[in-house]
UniProtKB/Swiss-Prot annotation:
Swiss-Prot/TrEMBL keywords: Disulfide bond, Glycoprotein, Self-incompatibility, Signal
The encoding gene: SLSG
Keyword Disulfide bond: yes
Protein name, per record: S-locus-specific glycoprotein S13
Annotated tissue distribution: Stigma.
């Protein structure tokens, strides 16, 4: 019996040691999504943080054509690595020595000389609990007190500092309490995550709108939120497993979207070549599907046709004067150089004017617009007629047969027509030009 017990003890000890060494050797493979103030991530350790649902992973990476290293987040379980956030995109690590840790209640990324190349740079008072960093299930990398999971009390979050991608639950636009404007900036190239030439950014005005730009040159205007969607991207309403929202109040003006089916994935991305795209991934997918891309047609281009004209993909040429208007420069117009736009055939008289109804339109740029949220279309028409500077009006919200009022008091710019997904625009004309 003693021999049996001795053999059993040896076997038990060997089993214990085997399990112990397996745990040590393969520790990085376990799905750990938090980083405490006593831990660190290094390039050499190959350790990563993995979100609880195993969808997102945070760690160090380098692109195929570069020896520089970045800290980023990517989709974990897809066959092709897709990056959604990069911390040090404009200040990469020059070699394979890098450390992410919590120091002084901030996340810091240190290079080979222990110099900080990126930090959350949060200024706080006395701390009552240790700080912890966590990769959440939605891909948000947050820093919080270790005893608080309240999202409103996050000390810092990557969702506030997007790179080129908007994920579900992220917000694109302004936090009016802090003045933070969350916008997208493209990669320099498909293999270079540094800040590129293109941005997608919200501009605050009576009706906030997003602009796709290259530097100061605008390429595309989103159109305002119409209650269902961003009006200049009608394709976005056609995904049944997604809901969209634009919040505008005293605290924020921001767009977001949510997934209603967790089997599908979607993201908005601004490409290094200047396209704003929605990409989707279905359970049967092997690659990301480009659901829509903008600008997709010359009618998507910013101010393609000039003032008082509209773009129609079904006409040739695509630029057309609004009823009651004629080309301002006939020679240029005939040469298909439409940027000078159109002018009225008959001057407005103020007292005897009327309106032509244009259906399925992208509303004009709202720089010179006035918004009244509490009145309907009839009252909107009356107010437009009573203002001799009013050039057009429309509903601000197309839900419930239309509510709210938008009045334009200047030139009507950047208009286009859609097959079925736009909204009614009422343009002021002299009585002689009404049909």
């Amino acid at each position: 019996m003693k021999g049996v017990k001795k053999t059993y003890d040896i076997s038990y000890t060997l089993s214990f040691l085997l399990v112990f060494f397996v745990l040590i050797l393969f520790r990085p493979a376990f799905s750990i999504n938090t980083l405490s103030s006593t831990e660190s991530l290094t390039i050499s350790s190959n350790r990563t943080l993995v979100s609880p649902g195993n969808v997102f992973e945070l760690g160090f990476f380098k692109t195929t054509s570069s020896s520089r290293w970045y800290l980023g987040i990517w989709y974990k379980k897809f066959p092709y690595r897709t990056y959604v956030w990069v911390a040090n995109r404009d200040n990469p690590l020059s070699n394979d020595i890098g450390t992410l840790k919590i120091s002084g209640n901030n996340l810091v990324l240190l290079d080979h000389s222990n110099k900080s190349v990126w930090s959350t740079n949060v200024t706080r008072g006395n701390e009552r609990s240790p700080v912890v960093a966590e990769l959440l299930d939605n891909g948000n990398f947050v820093m919080r007190d270790s005893n608080s999971n309240n999202a409103s009390q996050f000390l810092w979050q990557s969702f506030d500092y997007p790179t080129d991608t908007l994920l579900p639950e992220m917000k694109l636009g302004y936090d009016l309490k802090t003045g933070l404007n969350r916008f997208l900036t493209s990669w320099r190239s498909s293999d270079d995550p540094s800040s590129g030439d293109y941005s997608y950014k919200l501009e605050l005005r009576r009706l906030p709108e997003f602009y796709l730009s290259s530097g100061s040159f605008r390429l595309h205007r989103s159109g305002p939120w119409n209650g269902f969607r961003i009006s200049g991207i009608p394709e976005d309403q056609k995904l049944s497993y997604m809901v969209y929202n634009f919040t505008e109040n005293s605290e924020e003006a921001a767009y977001t979207f949510l997934m209603t089916n967790n089997s599908f994935y979607s993201r908005l991305t601004i490409s290094s070549t200047g396209y704003f795209e929605r990409l989707t991934w279905a359970p049967s997918s092997v690659v990301w599907n480009v659901f829509w891309s903008s600008p997709n047609h010359q009618c998507d281009m910013y101010r393609m046709c000039g003032p008082y004209s509209y773009c129609d993909v079904n006409t040739s040429p695509v630029c057309n004067c609004i009823q009651g208007f004629r080309p301002k420069n006939r020679q240029q117009w005939d040469l298909r150089i439409p940027t000078s736009g159109c002018i009225r055939r008959t001057r407005l008289s103020c007292s005897g004017d009327g309106f032509t109804r244009m259906k399925n339109m992208k509303l004009p740029e709202t720089t010179m617009a006035i918004v009244h949220r509490s009145i309907g279309l009839k009252e909107c028409e009356k107010r437009c007629l009573s203002d001799c500077n009013c050039t057009a009006f429309a509903n601000a919200d197309i839900r419930n047969r239309g509510t709210g009022c938008v009045i334009w008091t200047g030139e009507l710019e950047d208009i286009r027509t859609y097959f079925a997904d736009g909204q009614d625009l009422y343009v002021r004309l002299a009585a002689a030009d009404l049909v």
